[in-house]
From Swiss-Prot:
UniProt-listed Enzyme Commission number(s): 1.7.1.7
GO cellular component: cytosol; GMP reductase complex
InterPro entries: Aldolase_TIM, GMP_reductase, GMPR, IMP_DH/GMP_Rdtase_CS, IMP_DH_GMPRt
Species name: Salmonella typhi
Entry similarity comment: Belongs to the IMPDH/GMPR family. GuaC type 1 subfamily.
PROSITE patterns per the UniProt record, alphabetical: IMP_DH_GMP_RED (PS00487)
GO BP terms in the entry: purine nucleotide metabolic process
Name of the protein this chain belongs to: GMP reductase
Record gene name: guaC
Catalytic site: 186
Length: 347
């Protein structure tokens, strides 16, 4: 046993220090990034935000809506091959460019992903997702996926430390998904005592990944557009959002009515709700590590997407970044004990 004394920070612990700017308007800011990925060699351009691969966020409907904003969607792994085929038959090439195919690490997951990718060559992204990316089996699966799909861009996670980030990149991942426990409906930290404050995880993993020519996506912990800006400021190449995109018409959650008001269910993918739906319940050897919440219906996701992108553009103007690419170079974080004036938050 040992104790690390270095302070680790989350998004709530910092603000971005403003700096002089020559920008005249938020409209001057370019949010589109262009990436060429280390292993696949593929080039992609777009706004590097990803809707999370949760079945109450990462739906086909979400992909259709967010593609209009140049945003990616990691479509959840619980769609059948037949459902994928029906979606691909109606989706435009531009929508497919903004889609990630999500998978687990079982043999059945692998075979299903092989079939899905064979449906259309425009499916260029694979998101390999497990709660704990530190297992040797996971590393081996990433290597297997790279061998099977040499020209596909592979995103793999989740991890929170530099050495494991490097391991996954060396095994074939183009993008490493960073985050253990920060999600709005994740209870891993309280159930297991395991985790890592998200901003520090992003900073440390970005440093490790970029040294090898890889990239990272910050997954979890964002509650408002300012957190998205902080994640990019900390060095994230992509930012994945779950709770911020939940509760919308495109989100796919079940709708319930209470006292005449409608709510949408949103749950973590290791929650009892998710396991009851997809694997027949919580196995005897494990505990649920997620919760289920009821969100007031929030309408079309487009309104939220505009709010997120508007906040991100504004953050760039405050530090003089004319392009999103410049934000991390121009970011200085200051430690704080308050984020906002909350006097009217209860009204």
């Amino acid at each position: 046993m040992r104790i690390e004394e270095d302070l680790k920070l989350g998004f709530k612990d910092v603000l971005i220090r403003p700096k002089r700017s020559t920008l005249k308007s938020r409209s001057d800011v370019e949010l589109e990034r262009q990436f060429t990925f280390k292993h696949s060699g593929q080039t992609w351009s777009g706004v590097p935000i990803i809707a999370a691969n949760m079945d109450t966020v990462g739906t086909f409907e979400m992909a259709q809506a967010l593609a209009g904003f140049d945003i990616l969607t990691a479509v959840h792994k619980h769609y059948s091959v037949e459902e994928w085929a029906a979606f691909i038959n109606t989706a435009s090439a531009d929508v497919l460019k903004h889609v990630m195919v999500s998978t687990g690490t079982s043999d059945a997951d692998f075979e299903k992903t092989v079939q899905i990718l064979a449906l259309n060559p425009a499916l260029n992204f694979v998101c390999i997702d497990v709660a704990n990316g530190y297992s040797e089996h996971f590393v081996q699966f990433v290597a297997k996926a790279r061998e099977a799909w040499p020209s596909k861009t592979i995103c793999a996670g989740n991890v929170v430390t530099g050495e494991m980030c490097e391991e996954l990149i060396l095994s074939g991942a183009d993008i490493v998904k960073v985050g253990i426990g920060p999600g709005s409906v994740c209870t891993t930290r309280v159930k297991t005592g395991v985790g890592y404050p998200q901003l520090s995880a992003v900073i440390e993993c970005a440093d490790a990944a970029h040294g090898l020519g890889g990239m990272i996506v910050s997954d979890g912990g964002c509650t408002m557009p300012g957190d998205v800006a902080k994640a990019f400021g900390g060095g994230a190449d992509f930012v994945m959002l779950g709770g911020m995109l939940a509760g919308h018409e495109e989100s796919g959650g079940s709708v319930v009515e209470e006292n005449g008001e409608k709510f949408m269910l949103f749950y973590g993918m290791s929650s009892e709700s998710a396991m009851n739906r997809h694997v027949g319940g919580v196995a005897k050897y494990r505990a649920a590590e997620g919760k289920t919440v009821k969100l007031p219906l929030r309408g079309p996701v487009g309104n939220t997407a505009r709010d997120i992108l508007g906040g991100l553009r504004s953050a760039c103007t405050y530090v003089g970044a004319s392009r999103l690419k410049e934000l991390t170079k121009r970011t200085t974080f200051i430690r704080v004990q308050e984020q906002e004036n909350r006097i009217f938050n209860s009204l």
